[in-house]
Amino acid sequence: MKKNLIIVRGGGDIATGTIYKLVQSGYAVLVLETEFPSAIRRYAAFSEAVYEKEYKVEDVVCKLADTLEQAEAYMEQGILPIMIDADGSMIEKAQPAAVVDAILAKRNLGTNRSMAPFTVALGPGFLAGEDVDAVVETMRGHKLGRIIYEGSAIPNTGIPGVIAGVSKDRVIHAKAEGYLYGVHKIA
């Protein structure tokens, strides 16, 4: 793989902002996702490429790759590759310079400092200096984006941020498992 490769675990909407900045800054990036990714703002997320095989956010095209070789070929073409690899098994093979955990699960799903020379996690659930090298604060407010080298991000409150005066009432949770089929695009 490329020499200064950065692997980002997760391709949801918040992860996409990080990925986009890394790509625009000239880094080679490989995104790892689950087989059925979810995102709050699906149409602003590179994870849509898992479903669509190809997806564009602003001026960055993302394509689903089946192998590391195909992912590298996409990078050579200026295309952002995404692979289905929920457990991060490709990380050891790819030997990246850095791993960014942008899954935003509010807990550590296995990312650790042995994965790459430098590791970063977005949001709560990680301890900088132990689990990863750095944690980025994701809580709305004046600490948003702060890089933490010792300690952790603000714990998850479980309550959505206030938008237009509304907080938890703007989030709907399903009462049962199943599939939701969108019949209209929400842009």
Predicted feature descriptions by range:
Residues 2-187:
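Well-ordered secondary-structure scaffolds
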